[in-house]
């Protein structure tokens, strides 16, 4: 990685090369777990939860590959290196799922059994606190707003 790549990683959270590699990994992971995976739009999303104990603040980080298409959302929990991969969760009308978007909680998907709140990430500067817990990826503002519009519209 040259100087440009190093600077880009520091300010954007990922070099273009690293981001493209991670997007390809995400697609491969998704397609292995989801039938007709290429028919879904993929986004990397994350969530953070905070607990304030008496002496220490605890932050829990979660990473997700989220695929969406008309009438369905699939969520796959992953780690920041895309090596520890969870099961896929499918949400649609058939299993009484709901999707929502709000400026305060970002994207929500859930049914009677499980739910997720997450934020689609545009970029995360590597110099920000907690960036080492997130997938190194750059997603465009348009990609993020398209996902937000999808979640606002609901199923």
Map each language-model feature to its residues.
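Phosphoinositide-binding peripheral membrane targeting modules
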Residues: 53-115, 130-136, 155
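Intrinsic disorder/low-complexity signal
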Residues: 47, 71, 86, 142-145
């Amino acid at each position: 990685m040259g100087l440009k790549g190093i600077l880009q990683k520091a300010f954007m959270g990922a070099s273009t090369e690293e981001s493209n590699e991670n997007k390809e990994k995400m697609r491969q992971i998704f397609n292995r777990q989801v039938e007709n995976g290429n028919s879904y739009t993929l986004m990397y999303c994350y969530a953070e939860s905070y607990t304030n104990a008496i002496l220490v603040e605890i932050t829990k980080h979660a990473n997700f590959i989220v695929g969406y298409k008309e009438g369905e959302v699939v969520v796959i929990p992953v780690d920041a290196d895309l090596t520890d991969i969870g099961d896929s969760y499918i949400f649609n009308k058939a299993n009484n799922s709901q999707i929502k978007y709000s400026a305060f909680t970002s994207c929500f998907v859930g049914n009677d059994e499980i739910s997720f709140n997450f934020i689609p990430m545009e970029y995360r500067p590597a110099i920000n606190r907690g960036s080492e817990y997130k997938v190194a990826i750059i997603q465009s503002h348009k990609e993020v707003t398209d996902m937000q519009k999808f979640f606002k519209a609901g199923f």
